[in-house]
Amino acid sequence: MLRLRPAVRAVSVARSVALTRSLHVSVAKFNKIEGTAPAGLPKEVKQTAGHQGHHQEIPKPDENHPRRKKFHFWRSLWRLTYLSAIASLGYIGYRIYVIRNPSDQLPADPSKKTLVVLGSGWGSVSFLKKLDTSNYNVIVVSPRNYFLFTPLLPSCPTGTIEHRSIMEPIRGIIRHKQAECQYLEADATKIDHEKRIVTIRSAVSENSKEEVIKEIPFDYLVVGVGAMSSTFGIPGVQENACFLKEIPDAQQIRRTLMDCIEKAQFEKDPEVRKRLLHTVVVGGGPTGVEFAAELQDFFEDDLRKWIPDIRDDFKVTLVEALPNVLPSFSKKLIDYTEKTFSDEKISILTKTMVKSVDENVIRAEQTKGDGTKETLEMPYGTLVWATGNTVRPVVRELMSKIPAQKGSRRGLLVNEYLVVEGTEGIWALGDCSATKYAPTAQVASQEGSYLANLLNGIAKTEDLNNEITNLEKQSEHTFDEQERKNIFAQLESKSRKLRRSRAMLPFEYSHQGSLAYIGSDRAVADLSFNFWGIMNWSSGGTMTYYFWRSAYVSMCFSMRNKILVCIDWMKVRVFGRDISRE
């Protein structure tokens, strides 16, 4: 037996290994054609079996791998966000196009009844928004040719919101109605409910005292003229206070406030300086609370940076005659608001009644906890009066002519259908009416929507009555049996519709809740939900502040208002508020 040397043995082993590999490759090539692979082949060879190409098969990714699932989630979320942004921009663009390009309207029909609407506030505009103007010849009369979004009015004097951002032209509203409406910029001075005539007065120009007096006959009248600020007969309020109900009021507050700040720069007497920089807000309702909060924000965020000399003397005081501010809110939110004001260094004087006002000093009477009363004197630079309503002269004049209105002081007495007591075909809504509900924008808005549906139903009822009368006349002159059956079937159908249209329910207010901004990016919300019963939800803080903003934006009348308000908020966040006089 021959013994191989180690070198020869190594060569033989190498050749054997090479031969084995060659054999495996040959078998693999054969099995590519047959589509099978023997079980004994290595894993690398098995992976090539059954394929027509020469490349090794790439393993498929594991779809259930956590990283790949996460990647798919974020990619889907990005696509959804991208598509939502495109859809939102498309919708906004469409709405802007519709606003800028109103469609043609039906011409006025002299045969229709004349409906006169007095006012351009929450009640009147909500009424016009829902009214089918093709049923009437509509005439709108108001000295203010725009609708004002009053919940954001306290933000205007400080520059948080530009006043034009919360104004919507009345002509822009009625131009988008189905049929033509007429607008007259004038004051209603007299309402003759017996002759059914409204007398209006309009100035020809600002620089002319010449006036135009016109009488407008009407079939139906909607009175929504609102109310004026009440001074409660307190001496000096009308002459020295700034009110907060209209755009000119907000502009007057701005001028007065900046005048006091600029005067304080020249004043060396510390007491006079403190007086000039002291702003007193009378009224602890939402308007007064929100303005006090906005003013303190204006000082903290802007004034103290650009006018550092006033930082030690600037002061805001809120005066309320009731035991607490925001009386319509829950006790928890009242306490939270008062604590927030204390943290913001806003002074609150509750149970305090103003007795008189002169040019520089407010005299008030405060009731202590033990029932004793103390007289207070508050030097002030700016006085903002944000409490109380009283009826307008045209409403008072109408009330004096109707015996059923003699006992009313708050406004026109109305029944459950908002019809003015003692009249026919005259309705009143909003702050000019006296109901069991609070005089708020929410109440006026719901009254306007209800009244529009009521008037639409009245028009439908009249049309059905006319159609029934015509069918009855037609049946008298028809002798064909089949045609008579068709007429009677139509009469029965229209009679059912007539009964349904007449079955109008009385007005019922649905309270949705109350909101108020309390400063430092915080707000309070007292909301009501009707889910199998009334449910109340109270909240306060920063998250409620963002809810307050989103709610007010959604309540803005038009897409234009929504966009402008959001832009104003962004401008203040980026650049701060303007500190110029105007």
Swiss-Prot record:
Q: Where does NAD(+) bind?
A: 277-313
Where FAD is bound, by residue?
114-144
Which Gene3D superfamilies does this entry report, sorted A to Z? 3.50.50.100
Q: Which family does it belong to?
A: Belongs to the NADH dehydrogenase family.
Q: How does it sit in the membrane?
A: Peripheral membrane protein
Which keywords belong to this entry? Coiled coil, FAD, Flavoprotein, Membrane, Mitochondrion, Mitochondrion inner membrane, NAD, Oxidoreductase, Transit peptide
Q: Which GO terms describe its molecular function?
A: NADH:ubiquinone reductase (non-electrogenic) activity; oxidoreductase activity
| Residue ranges, annotated region (Disordered) | 46-65
Where in or outside the cell is it found?
Answer: Mitochondrion inner membrane
Q: Which domain of life is it from?
A: Eukaryota
By its UniProt entry, which SUPFAM superfamilies does this protein fall under? FAD/NAD(P)-binding domain
- The UniProt entry's coiled-coil ranges are 454-501
Q: How is the cofactor bound?
A: Binds 1 FAD per subunit.
Q: Which reaction does it catalyse?
A: a quinone + NADH + H(+) = a quinol + NAD(+); a ubiquinone + NADH + H(+) = a ubiquinol + NAD(+)
Which EC numbers characterise this protein's activity in its record?
1.6.5.9
Name of the protein described by the UniProt record: External alternative NADH-ubiquinone oxidoreductase, mitochondrial
Where is composition skewed (Basic and acidic residues) in this entry? Answer: 54-65
Q: Where is the transit peptide?
A: 1-30
Pfam families listed in its UniProt record: NDH2_C, Pyr_redox_2
Question: What is the role of the protein in this entry?
Answer: Alternative NADH-ubiquinone oxidoreductase which catalyzes the oxidation of mitochondrial NADH does not translocate protons across the inner mitochondrial membrane.
Q: Name one GO cellular component term.
A: mitochondrion
Q: What is the lineage of its organism?
A: Eukaryota, Fungi, Dikarya, Ascomycota, Saccharomycotina
Main localization category? mitochondrion
- Cofactors: FAD
